[in-house]
Amino acid sequence: MSSSKMNGRSIRINRVPATIFAILLTIVLVYFLNFHQEERPAIYGKLRSDNPNRVNLRKMLIAAIQASQRGGLEVLDVARSRQLKVRSKGQTDEGVNDPFTDADGRSHCVMKQGLQRIFPRVRIFSEEDKEHCKESHSYDLDPTVLHETAQVPDVSVNAQDVTVWVDPLDATKEFTEELYEYVTTMVCVAVAGRPVIGVIHSPFNGQTAWAWVGNSMSEYLAGLHPPHGQENELPIITVSRSHTAGAKDLARGIFGEQVNLLTAAGAGYKVLQVVANNATAYLHTSKIKKWDICAGDAILHALGGTMTTLNDQLIRYGPDESPVNTEGLLATLEKHDKYMDQLVKYRTAHNGQLA
């Protein structure tokens, strides 16, 4: 006990409650600090694994979703500024101009640098790898990008088995034409050459479709209804609006002149049309880059669908594989074997040719 005098009166201060309060405050602080030391890495993940030779796929899924969404914000920002600074990378094999904009470059820098900082030993391929990034970009992992009911386990694999494919802006030509519905940003994670995680983000409607094969998927994909077409119903084939001649002719040759054709842009968008049952198949007859198709391949696989070359071969996405698929592709949610059989019959009838 201690005492002091004020206005001639003696005041006694009881130190016991103050001591108890100090002890309780210390306990709370210790608990808080321990929680953040032990639990935060489990939730948010250390930026780099304790074992740099291993990669946690749960963290990679979170990072892939964030990367695609952050890239999408860059695309939106450039679109709103109306300062696209369009230049040409040349022409495609079909003679179509292949444009490049500031949105492609800015999205690339945000997406690839962010992923590479978190996973420094993983091989990451981006469509715009030649682009020089003037600024350094990074972000912390945020698990809130996953919906609450997502069943996402902690699974680790060897870093050397992982390859990431990034498309910073799919459908650039349509982006310059303000056909924004076709525009997507995409990330795909392949393990041992096969796609296991796919993310397709649509910046202009805010929808992010993601799937981890055998584990979980976004609420949007989980809420889709399975196909319910009749057996004899004509299929709806989605083909590219930029180079449609070969695909249209092949579709008519296989399924008849009355086949329904849905022209669209962007490989990511066309896969989303298949998974949403707006198209029964996505047909592409010329070469296509793997960052355009890897995410869609993973999502289709997670939903029970299939993507193959026109020679009915699964597509490989390993680090030593060519970044270009030269054998065309057929992507379906169901009846893949049936459509492939019809394609083989057409090829046989035309001396092995598809056009």
From Swiss-Prot:
Topology in the lipid bilayer: Single-pass membrane protein
Lineage, uppermost ranks: Eukaryota, Metazoa, Ecdysozoa, Arthropoda, Hexapoda
Entry's transmembrane regions: 16-36
Gene Ontology terms, MF aspect: 3'-nucleotidase activity; inositol monophosphate 1-phosphatase activity; metal ion binding
Statement: the UniProt record of this protein carries the keyword Hydrolase: yes
Keyword Transmembrane appears in the UniProt entry: yes
Pfam assignment, any one: Inositol_P
Catalytic activity entry: a myo-inositol phosphate + H2O = myo-inositol + phosphate
GO term, biological process aspect, one: signal transduction
Organism (species): Drosophila pseudoobscura pseudoobscura (Fruit fly)
Assigned protein family: Belongs to the inositol monophosphatase superfamily.
Gene Ontology CC entries for this record: cytoplasm; endomembrane system; membrane
UniProt-annotated binding residues for Mg(2+) 1: 127, 167, 169
Key words, A-Z: Hydrolase, Magnesium, Membrane, Metal-binding, Transmembrane, Transmembrane helix
Name of the protein in its database record: Putative inositol monophosphatase 3
